[in-house]
């Protein structure tokens, strides 16, 4: 797996107000506990810094309601890839119709929830800069949605340990929202069903309902129509994710999309082929690649170089969602030029594999954290 050279520790974003209460207790700097993990390969090292507020969150949850059967919760929030993505038309509401095979993968964030003494506001903190911690964040939107639908008056303190980069086409924010809905339901004693959570979630994001599948699904409409599927691939099939520092604006990608230049392959044919034959380059069609490559020409060059340098090591190389992550399925390792070329010194790298979940359980965190990058700056700055 790709690992990184020893970086300096960059500043973590943190909202101190998130840890103030009306009681005599207050936030202590001792709660900032950088966790360092090192691994070495090809003379490179990885340093991962994670803000860990466990002690504070645990105390708050216990103090709020000692009788509550569950007062705090730690959940894995995995991202997804689009194995294929067809854009089939434009709707009257301005959205596009799509048909896509979504699959959850083992790269993800960790979110910690605790009951809050507040009766009016959720408090969110995170370990990276550039991620909003107010009502713009999908986690807060999801919690507000849950209270609106159920009448619950419970609020939460949340810490988001972010590993999935933003602007990557991986659905990290959508996964966070789905995870928050699941957590709110658990911390309220399971007031509603999974199906209800899934139905509600489409009100705040088209990709969110997918995460209430079992991990693999054929999604249509805006993405909110979810047909659960059995896993079409071995779950241990490895892949590598390579995301350049530049992000693709989803709005700009769709603005440059020309429906007369999209693939003419029936998405149901793609689904049948991938189910029967597994992953191949011909199956991993993404109609958003041409407009994304127009927005970010270096992304097209990156994909071409990975295919050329892989020498058959990857079963397929393709872009996920609206970009800017390029996926290579079949190997967890990036091509050597990613290490050698100065142009790619700040890319985000992660190995991953497919994953699913059991009914009435959330996604389980993998035994090891696989995300890594080739610099501290790209590791810590997700803007």
From Swiss-Prot:
What protein name does the entry list? 4-diphosphocytidyl-2-C-methyl-D-erythritol kinase, chloroplastic
Q: What is its EC number?
A: 2.7.1.148
Classification via PANTHER family? 4-DIPHOSPHOCYTIDYL-2-C-METHYL-D-ERYTHRITOL KINASE, CHLOROPLASTIC
Q: Which GO terms describe its molecular function?
A: 4-(cytidine 5'-diphospho)-2-C-methyl-D-erythritol kinase activity; ATP binding
Q: Enumerate the catalysed reactions.
A: 4-CDP-2-C-methyl-D-erythritol + ATP = 4-CDP-2-C-methyl-D-erythritol 2-phosphate + ADP + H(+)
Transit sequence range: 1-72
Source organism (scientific name) = Arabidopsis thaliana (Mouse-ear cress)
- Gene Ontology biological process: isopentenyl diphosphate biosynthetic process, methylerythritol 4-phosphate pathway; terpenoid biosynthetic process
- Localization: Plastid, Chloroplast stroma
Q: Which family does it belong to?
A: Belongs to the GHMP kinase family. IspE subfamily.
Extract the NCBIfam families matched here.
Answer: ispE
The disruption phenotype is: Albino phenotype and seedling lethal when homozygous. The phenotype is caused by an early arrest in chloroplast differentiation.
Q: Which UniProt keywords apply?
A: ATP-binding, Chloroplast, Isoprene biosynthesis, Kinase, Nucleotide-binding, Plastid, Transferase, Transit peptide
Q: Which GO terms describe its cellular component?
A: chloroplast; chloroplast stroma
Instruction: Quote the function comment for this protein.
Output: Enzyme of the plastid non-mevalonate pathway for isoprenoid biosynthesis that catalyzes the phosphorylation of the position 2 hydroxy group of 4-diphosphocytidyl-2C-methyl-D-erythritol. Is essential for chloroplast development.
């Amino acid at each position: 797996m790709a690992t990184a050279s020893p970086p300096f520790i960059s500043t973590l974003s943190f909202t101190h107000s998130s840890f103030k209460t009306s009681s005599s207790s207050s936030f202590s700097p001792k709660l900032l506990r950088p966790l360092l993990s090192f691994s070495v390969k090809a003379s490179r090292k990885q340093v991962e810094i994670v803000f860990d507020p466990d002690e504070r969150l645990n105390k708050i949850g216990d103090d709020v309601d000692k009788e509550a059967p569950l007062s705090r919760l730690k959940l894995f929030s995995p991202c997804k890839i689009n194995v294929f993505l067809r854009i089939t038309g434009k709707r009257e509401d301005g959205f596009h119709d799509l048909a896509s095979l979504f699959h959850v993968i083992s790269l993800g964030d960790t979110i910690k929830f605790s009951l809050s003494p507040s009766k009016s506001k959720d408090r969110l903190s995170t370990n990276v800069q550039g991620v909003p911690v107010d009502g713009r964040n999908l986690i807060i939107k999801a919690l507000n949605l849950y209270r609106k639908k159920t009448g619950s008056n419970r609020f939460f303190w949340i810490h988001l340990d972010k590993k999935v980069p933003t602007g990557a086409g991986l659905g990290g924010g959508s996964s966070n929202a789905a995870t928050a809905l699941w957590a709110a339901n658990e911390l309220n004693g399971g007031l509603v069903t999974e199906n209800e959570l899934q139905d509600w979630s489409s009100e705040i994001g088209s990709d969110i309902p997918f995460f209430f599948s079992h991990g693999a699904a054929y999604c249509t409409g805006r993405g909110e129509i979810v047909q659960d599927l059995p896993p079409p691939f071995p779950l241990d099939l490895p892949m590598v994710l390579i995301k350049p520092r530049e992000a693709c604006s989803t709005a700009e990608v769709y603005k440059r999309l020309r429906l007369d230049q999209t693939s003419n392959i029936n998405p149901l044919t793609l689904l049948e082929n991938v189910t029967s034959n597994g992953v191949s380059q011909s199956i991993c069609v993404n109609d958003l690649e041409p407009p994304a490559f127009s927005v970010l020409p270096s992304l097209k060059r990156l994909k071409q170089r990975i295919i050329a340098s892989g020498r058959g090591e990857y079963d397929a190389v393709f872009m996920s969602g609206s970009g800017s992550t390029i996926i290579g399925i079949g190997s967890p390792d990036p091509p050597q030029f990613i290490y050698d070329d100065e142009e790619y010194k700040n890319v985000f790298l992660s190995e991953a594999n497919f994953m699913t979940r059991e009914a009435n359980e959330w996604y389980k965190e993998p035994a090891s954290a696989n995300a890594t990058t080739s610099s501290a700056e790209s590791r810590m700055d997700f803007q």
